[in-house]
Amino acid sequence: MSLAAVAREIHYSKSALAYFETGERTPPPDAIAWYEKRFGGLKDPVAALADLGKADVERRTFLRAGYSTALSASVLLPGWIDPSPRTVGGAVRNIGRADVSAVREVMSLFSRMDQRMGGGHGRTAVVQYLTTEVVGYLNGTYTDNTVRNDMFSAAAELAYLVGWMAFDNDEHHVAQRYFSTATKLAAEADDAPLTGHVLRAMAHQAIDLGHPEEGLRLAEASVTGARYRTASPRERALLKVVHAKALSAARRPADAARALLTAEQDLAAASAQIPEPARVFFFSEASLAHETACALRDAGDLSGAAAQFELSVRKREATAFTRTHAVTLGYLGAVQADQGDLELACATWSSALTAMQGVQSGRTRNVARDIRNATAAHSNSTTAAINQIGDQASQYLAAHAT
């Protein structure tokens, strides 16, 4: 559907709609409500999840192509992240604790696969499970209300994971719909920390796509009230790190530094004695160092950024977190090149490209593309490895084209 066609229906000008969709202006509530009605509001999250998964598997165009700031902003409207009355369908048997555990085991399996192999691997399998087994559970009857809430929470985590995998594979409009659905499922479960977890992913996406104001709104929503207050220390640290990322993107370096300090304190408070959700298994000292390095790099502190990227590389378990390890190495190489040490940068980039072999991820593709462009810009350098590294990056991109 073209902008002109949308403009005829909603009675906003094409230029106004373009501003809304690019994030240059915040869409008013009536525009957001119209987008949701026209392109698929999520009044019943279970039905929405089933429809979304079916459309995803069949690769249908179930949303206007591209990221829409209006859709992500809609989750911040009053009443959006609230449970909605539903009629629960019948089931062959009661859904119990073992069923919840099964969903969580699947979530853990595919989360770890995503960390190693990237979001381009296995998403269809997760969607099939989500829209058959899990939707069946959500439409079932439960042994008690605690089990019901736990099942909705598990389903929300799985929907979030599918969204994260799509985000990682540069399928941003798909990711956005899953994230929005996950917030509604989390609300049905009355799971405030999980809602915050999904909102910080949406903030991350908005920032990466060049919508800093939208990213900051979502990040601030993720650390508001019970979403942050009732989260475990490790999850609070994750929420605060993305909040810092958003503040940095909004050119508020002092506020970003304070948020990073809070994240560091939260992570230090995490311990084996404090229960925490399995979904935060990936967030560690290496993750915090990576985000701190990004903030320092963006603020122009190349020496500080290099030190933090190096710390992240040392602390991360590379085999279990292959994708992020490769990305961190790529970023470190770029900082080293900016510092004028092309020989060291080439060695680091070579390690990054070796690490990302077999990883199907938009983020590793972006790193490889940046490496190729950087080496091309220095093709006349006396550094012997420069052209070899550029060729290696081109080979990765050719082998992992989407």
Locate predicted features.
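DNA major-groove recognition helix of helix-turn-helix/homeodomain DNA-binding modules
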Residues: 28-46
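Compositionally biased, long intrinsically disordered regions
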Residues: 41-99
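Residues that mark the N-terminal boundary/hinge immediately upstream of a DNA-recognition element
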Residues: 2, 28-31, 58-59
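Short alpha-helical DNA-recognition segment
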Residues: 1-19
